[in-house]
Amino acid sequence: MPAPEQASLVEEGQPQTRQEAASTGPGMEPETTATTILASVKEQELQFQRLTRELEVERQIVASQLERCRLGAESPSIASTSSTEKSFPWRSTDVPNTGVSKPRVSDAVQPNNYLIRTEPEQGTLYSPEQTSLHESEGSLGNSRSSTQMNSYSDSGYQEAGSFHNSQNVSKADNRQQHSFIGSTNNHVVRNSRAEGQTLVQPSVANRAMRRVSSVPSRAQSPSYVISTGVSPSRGSLRTSLGSGFGSPSVTDPRPLNPSAYSSTTLPAARAASPYSQRPASPTAIRRIGSVTSRQTSNPNGPTPQYQTTARVGSPLTLTDAQTRVASPSQGQVGSSSPKRSGMTAVPQHLGPSLQRTVHDMEQFGQQQYDIYERMVPPRPDSLTGLRSSYASQHSQLGQDLRSAVSPDLHITPIYEGRTYYSPVYRSPNHGTVELQGSQTALYRTGSVGIGNLQRTSSQRSTLTYQRNNYALNTTATYAEPYRPIQYRVQECNYNRLQHAVPADDGTTRSPSIDSIQKDPREFAWRDPELPEVIHMLQHQFPSVQANAAAYLQHLCFGDNKVKMEVCRLGGIKHLVDLLDHRVLEVQKNACGALRNLVFGKSTDENKIAMKNVGGIPALLRLLRKSIDAEVRELVTGVLWNLSSCDAVKMTIIRDALSTLTNTVIVPHSGWNNSSFDDDHKIKFQTSLVLRNTTGCLRNLSSAGEEARKQMRSCEGLVDSLLYVIHTCVNTSDYDSKTVENCVCTLRNLSYRLELEVPQARLLGLNELDDLLGKESPSKDSEPSCWGKKKKKKKRTPQEDQWDGVGPIPGLSKSPKGVEMLWHPSVVKPYLTLLAESSNPATLEGSAGSLQNLSAGNWKFAAYIRAAVRKEKGLPILVELLRMDNDRVVSSVATALRNMALDVRNKELIGKYAMRDLVNRLPGGNGPSVLSDETMAAICCALHEVTSKNMENAKALADSGGIEKLVNITKGRGDRSSLKVVKAAAQVLNTLWQYRDLRSIYKKDGWNQNHFITPVSTLERDRFKSHPSLSTTNQQMSPIIQSVGSTSSSPALLGIRDPRSEYDRTQPPMQYYNSQGDATHKGLYPGSSKPSPIYISSYSSPAREQNRRLQHQQLYYSQDDSNRKNFDAYRLYLQSPHSYEDPYFDDRVHFPASTDYSTQYGLKSTTNYVDFYSTKRPSYRAEQYPGSPDSWV
């Protein structure tokens, strides 16, 4: 994989190349003196003379080679061969390596940044540093790292951790066009298309062409070019059509007729050479081979005894072209071979009037050879030399042809690295593009690669080409998706899209070796199929595996169908296997692909599949052994995504909790560090590993009771999470995702502490105090003995309660571990976040933590309520009621309800917060309408605040709360759900119990009917608001049944059918939907039909039954038989004691057994909020019996 900085290196080279290309135009002003130019010309002339002599020797050798090969192949063309051991040195040993060639007067002046070689080594005018045609990571050819898949991108994934399509979009820099001056202009345009795409404009047609039948192997040639000379690599798009080696654009006063697009993956140049035809016989077609020499041990050594084919477009050909090649009757041209094997020249299409000038030679300078000199042998994991699975080069047909056309040299196909040992690439009909006459094949455009791939249909166009069935000449039109190609045809009599135009004289051509071996679709730009990519994950080369994983990551981004298909094809197992790979890049890309595959709520199957193939242990192994920050970030990101699946949570807790805590949480939090310096603070605040891990723990903390127990008992976890919050509070980092995750995790771990933590039970439940403003129901030392009351000594305040001042009873030492969850010291950071943070999730989590901690009758819940009052937290909570965020208001309202369990808190809330609570009720000009859950929470807070406090009840009436509550219960305005109606009816019922206030109510126009809502009305409203209920349920409704009396109603008596338990999978917030209301059906005494609307909410029916029997006649008469047996709405409230007396004198005489939640039918479990997971866990009502602080 290319490093991220690779892109910047390429981009840096582009402007310079454009400058070079632009500076070669004929309109440039000379920049050097005439003396310097003349000196340069003389020096060039001396070199050209020497080159002319060498080229004459080459011409003789090439002529004999061409004749022999043509006869051997029994065809009018000859095949080119690539060298195996030696290559021709293009300069003698006595000539220095480099030199500066001065510009000449006769042509456009060369800029000074062109370092032209002064010996025959002149090849191109650019070096790897100037353009992107360098063999660096990700480039095609013999790359050093070869981590790029040949068929995709030369830039690759710049960032393996990213899974956004946009990171690999082609660089659309709208590069300037380079015009090539001549009788007609040929343009190579670099537009905003993907890297490597080129636009070639043909100008002259019907040129009989020679064919270069084979291009040497990529292992030997890093910069092979085809056809018109356009270089294949990304930077080559700014090169000249007249260059045989992809040099920058040159001044070329001849008409050009490019016949094919360039390709970095094209195995052979299917182009013709104008040098090979005579004007009298334009249809004579010959094949020019690039017969290169064998490599010598000394690349700079003297010229060997034989030279190879005419390298049209090479600088060494140009001098001879002035004297010999310029004549259209010249048959063949001698040329020296490249410095190293495999350098293939590209024939040019020249008009009969062309005279190539000395200036052309300067355009082929040192830079191409700089590339060769910088090349190293291919590394073992590169794709060079890999045998193709389309047609093995060891096939009998291929061997025969090689022996025929190349008797003494072995041909290595250039595109052997294109395909892999995968049967999916095999095709029953291999073909090639065989064109007749002057037609050439349109092979492939653009440099290929993942990095520039965009998975949109607009990136492709369909071009047709011919397919030959191996060596047969039967052709068929075949359509294949290509990368979009922009071109214009100018006055040419052949069609690029229809390559079946017959030859001028009908000459039949035999296919080349590559034409026989390769399927043309292999050279066309196409997306690999998903099975192919998954198969590449098992490739023997790490580069292929890395790129296949990166491509999967790219494909899976935002595409659930692809994710499911990858899982079905077994790709997850292969990716998990790559996690143990020794190559870092493979590990990164595998993690990135897995992270995308398991992202989203609809990928639970992928998450389960990853768990089943051992993905979690593999991730943990990689996390423990890797020191690379990016790998650790990716691993924890995968675990975070996995943790959102309920079926995987416990596996992660069992296998990964300890590792995550000890490897990430504790070290990154700084909890165990003696000094927490500024550098660590910066690292801590920007740690993506810590963010991902805390997000994973946040999901795991909602997996249920067992998960919470294991997380609480994990050493260092609670301490580190709280330390993170303290640190962020001290550094004013209130809104980060890490803080949010920590707060929400602690909120879930604070759920039901007194029942799930043994230490909490020992510390708090055995010591019942009267912190609620009432006496303990038991005067005995044993809490389980209720009948026998034993006198005890009156405890001092320091022994049995804590009002927020002084030492905390029961905690003599500094808390640690799980004890820190309920210690009153946690209140301050929570309140700080509530006051300072602007992140709604953090606000909700902090309020929810206080809500959970203040719930219950145990001692530390009372301590928390006192600590909130001491830290001035009540005004902070009340102010948050005004937020326009539904979930924050719901959490804050429930927290206020729990805070009101403390007598002093209740007085403060009634005095200062009553109007804010009433304003959030529907109606009036208050903020936006809230959800039913939030409305029910506000009503429950009002109910608790007004219970046993007449002053607060009067404040509610004065603030206009009665009107809003009556509108809810009577169904006026927007119809509220049954849950809200019941909660509002409870508040009204509580208000009516204060007899001293009834006169005030009547003055305001209210009577008993407004405060006491019949159950039948609730039932009727319920069916009106839920029209989806079936008529069967309505017929079975208790409304139309005769039920005896209300005294026998199991709802009012608290008798619950043992079968009427909520299903464990039912989320607590879905109890009152249109279907959930009819979920639990059970027979009740005194009725011959089951009630379809039996909602269970009792936690201790026996105690409730005894209490309700005493007050069953309070509101209903015995003869009222049409009452709903519906237990969620209670009208059996105990009347306040002695209303005529001062209320607060009697408040301490209420027995604790008359707890408020069961008294008013409030559900017990949902007072604790546990919502921070993908799916909220469910808890049955009976899991938390006897809670005094649960809400509806």
From Swiss-Prot:
Assembly and binders: Interacts with PDZD2. Interacts (via the C-terminus) with FRMPD2 (via the PDZ 2 domain). Interacts with RHOA; the interaction is detected at the midbody. Interacts with ECT2; the interaction is detected at the midbody. Interacts with CCDC85B.
Keywords, sorted A to Z: Cell adhesion, Cell junction, Cell membrane, Coiled coil, Cytoplasm, Cytoskeleton, Membrane, Methylation, Phosphoprotein, Repeat
Native source species: Homo sapiens (Human)
Bias (Polar residues): 77-86, 138-156, 163-204, 214-230, 1067-1077
Cross-referenced PROSITE patterns: ARM_REPEAT
Compositional bias annotation for Basic and acidic residues: 773-782
Name of the gene: PKP4
Taxonomic lineage: Eukaryota, Metazoa, Chordata, Craniata, Vertebrata
Residue ranges, annotated region (Disordered): 1-31, 73-262, 290-310, 323-348, 773-810, 1058-1086
SMART domains linked: ARM
Skewed-composition ranges (Low complexity): 231-242, 325-338
Record protein name field: Plakophilin-4
Pfam families: Arm
Gene3D superfamilies named in the record: Leucine-rich Repeat Variant
Subcellular localization(s) per the UniProt record: Cell junction, Desmosome; Cytoplasm, Cytoskeleton, Spindle; Midbody; Cell membrane
Gene Ontology annotations of biological process type: cell-cell adhesion; cell-cell junction assembly; cell-cell signaling; positive regulation of cytokinesis; regulation of cell adhesion; regulation of Rho protein signal transduction
Function: Plays a role as a regulator of Rho activity during cytokinesis. May play a role in junctional plaques.
GO molecular function, one term: cadherin binding
Family: Belongs to the beta-catenin family.
Residues annotated with Phosphoserine modification: 75, 106, 132, 136, 139, 221, 231, 236, 273, 281, 314, 327, 337, 392, 403, 406, 422, 427, 438, 510, 512, 515, 776, 1045, 1091, 1100, 1135
Membrane topology: Peripheral membrane protein
Ranges of the ARM repeats in the UniProt entry: 415-455, 518-557, 560-599, 604-644, 660-702, 706-751, 815-855, 862-901, 950-993
Coiled coil: 36-70
Modified residues (Omega-N-methylarginine): R254, R270
